[in-house]
């Protein structure tokens, strides 16, 4: 009887740090039925909620503090949370003996990567954004390999074992069902404008939607997060969340997407060849979304409006320009596809299987 392969994934805080890991796990399950999957994350967190929807992944809670570049009294207590997270990860790894640990980003991913280094367990960290966050900068000092989602990120990891893999997307996005968006929009013949606030929702996008939805002749799909109730009105559908199949259909078949500029969302839009207006998140952010969107804007792959320049009239004018200029829309759709031009889930899954082979051979 073959010994079970075992892999730990770790990452969280937002869906963008969780869904890529799930995409890799789904592909690994297709390729090899002899693998056990674990996820290390914080209790009652975004990753806890998402992972518990997947019975084949065992979730293990670990403590971890937020890593900050600025002074805060919380830095003192969070430092000890990180230490406790490393200690707990150390003993969890010793107990379950995974052959590989794969980090998908977020502060919670650093303690397991550091513990893996102490125990000489193979580890890989994946930077989803254009430039590395503090967690990835820390992880890169301890991990054996670094995977990146943007080719342009290589310059941030000099003298490191870096591989451009792209960002994995969930399998539901590979073949979206057009009937889903027809049902969501009651088979409207109007242009479809989808405003997506991400896994945490976005207050500024919620306000924007309510202000413009009756000023443009279109059907609006609005993903609002927990701060608003779901509703359906004439030419307007609002939901706190959409499942993966619904989101895949929305992204593929909407005429326009208005969204934040998280790396996971960008890759899903690129895979679909979506026409996107990005409004990057600023408050509480390290500026990664601004740089993500700026890169695409420079390649004529999107429209970008910074929050400080956002106005009702500006967004309405851009929407009208896209709807009235099909050539411009097609240029944006073709150019954004260049940011997701490989099957990243399959690539990474096969790389991990090779790592398992090397470990077992050794």
UniProtKB/Swiss-Prot annotation:
Its main location: membrane. InterPro entries: GlcNAc_MurG (IPR006009), Glyco_trans_28_C (IPR007235), GlycoTrans_28_N (IPR004276). GO terms for biological process: carbohydrate metabolic process; cell division; cell wall organization; lipid glycosylation; peptidoglycan biosynthetic process; regulation of cell shape. It is an enzyme of class 2 (transferase). Pathway: Cell wall biogenesis; peptidoglycan biosynthesis. It is found in: Cell inner membrane. It is a peripheral membrane protein. The keyword Isomerase does not apply. Its EC number is 2.4.1.227. The keyword Membrane applies. Signal peptide: none annotated. Pfam families: Glyco_tran_28_C, Glyco_transf_28. UDP-N-acetyl-alpha-D-glucosamine binds at residues 14-16, 170, 199, 289. Gene3D superfamilies: Glycogen Phosphorylase B. It catalyses: di-trans,octa-cis-undecaprenyl diphospho-N-acetyl-alpha-D-muramoyl-L-alanyl-D-glutamyl-meso-2,6-diaminopimeloyl-D-alanyl-D-alanine + UDP-N-acetyl-alpha-D-glucosamine = di-trans,octa-cis-undecaprenyl diphospho-[N-acetyl-alpha-D-glucosaminyl-(1->4)]-N-acetyl-alpha-D-muramoyl-L-alanyl-D-glutamyl-meso-2,6-diaminopimeloyl-D-alanyl-D-alanine + UDP + H(+). One of its GO terms (cellular component) is plasma membrane. PANTHER family: UDP-N-ACETYLGLUCOSAMINE--N-ACETYLMURAMYL-(PENTAPEPTIDE) PYROPHOSPHORYL-UNDECAPRENOL N-ACETYLGLUCOSAMINE TRANSFERASE (PTHR21015:SF27), UDP-N-ACETYLGLUCOSAMINE--N-ACETYLMURAMYL-(PENTAPEPTIDE) PYROPHOSPHORYL-UNDECAPRENOL N-ACETYLGLUCOSAMINE TRANSFERASE 1 (PTHR21015). Belongs to the glycosyltransferase 28 family. MurG subfamily. NCBIfam families: murG. Cell wall formation. Catalyzes the transfer of a GlcNAc subunit on undecaprenyl-pyrophosphoryl-MurNAc-pentapeptide (lipid intermediate I) to form undecaprenyl-pyrophosphoryl-MurNAc-(pentapeptide)GlcNAc (lipid intermediate II). This is UDP-N-acetylglucosamine--N-acetylmuramyl-(pentapeptide) pyrophosphoryl-undecaprenol N-acetylglucosamine transferase.
């Amino acid at each position: 009887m073959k010994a079970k392969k075992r892999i730990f994934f770790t990452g969280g805080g937002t869906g963008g740090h969780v869904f890529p890991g799930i995409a890799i796990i789904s592909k690994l399950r297709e390729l090899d039925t002899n693998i056990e999957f674990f996820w290390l994350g914080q209790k009652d967190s975004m990753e806890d909620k998402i992972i518990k929807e997947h019975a084949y992944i065992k979730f293990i809670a670990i403590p971890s503090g937020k890593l900050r570049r600025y002074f805060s009294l919380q830095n003192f207590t969070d430092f000890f949370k990180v230490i406790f997270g490393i200690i707990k990860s150390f003993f969890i790894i010793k107990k379950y003996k995974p052959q590989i640990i794969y980090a998908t980003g977020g502060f919670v991913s650093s303690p397991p990567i550091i513990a893996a280094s102490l125990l000489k367990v193979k580890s890989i960290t994946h930077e989803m954004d254009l430039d590395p966050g503090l967690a990835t900068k820390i992880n890169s000092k301890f991990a054996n390999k670094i995977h990146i989602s943007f080719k342009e990120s290589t310059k941030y990891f000099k003298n490191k074992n870096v591989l451009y893999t792209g960002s994995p997307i969930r399998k539901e996005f590979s073949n979206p069902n057009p009937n889903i968006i027809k049902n969501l929009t009651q088979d409207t013949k109007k242009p479809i404008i989808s405003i997506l606030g991400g896994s945490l929702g976005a207050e500024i996008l919620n306000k924007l939607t309510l202000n413009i939805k009756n000023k443009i002749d279109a059907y609006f799909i609005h993903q609002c997060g927990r701060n608003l109730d779901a509703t359906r009105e004439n030419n307007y559908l609002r939901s706190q969340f959409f499942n993966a199949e619904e989101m895949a259909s929305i992204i593929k078949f909407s005429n326009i997407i208005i969204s934040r500029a998280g790396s996971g969302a960008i890759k899903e839009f690129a895979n679909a060849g979506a026409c996107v207006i990005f409004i990057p998140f600023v408050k509480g952010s390290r500026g990664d979304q601004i740089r993500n969107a700026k890169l695409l804007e420079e390649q004529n792959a999107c429209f970008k409006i910074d929050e400080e320049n956002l106005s009702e009239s500006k967004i309405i004018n851009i929407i009208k320009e896209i709807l009235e200029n099909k050539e411009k829309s097609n240029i944006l759709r073709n150019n954004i596809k260049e940011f997701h031009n490989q099957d990243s889930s399959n690539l990474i899954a096969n790389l991990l299987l090779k790592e398992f082979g090397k470990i077992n051979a050794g």
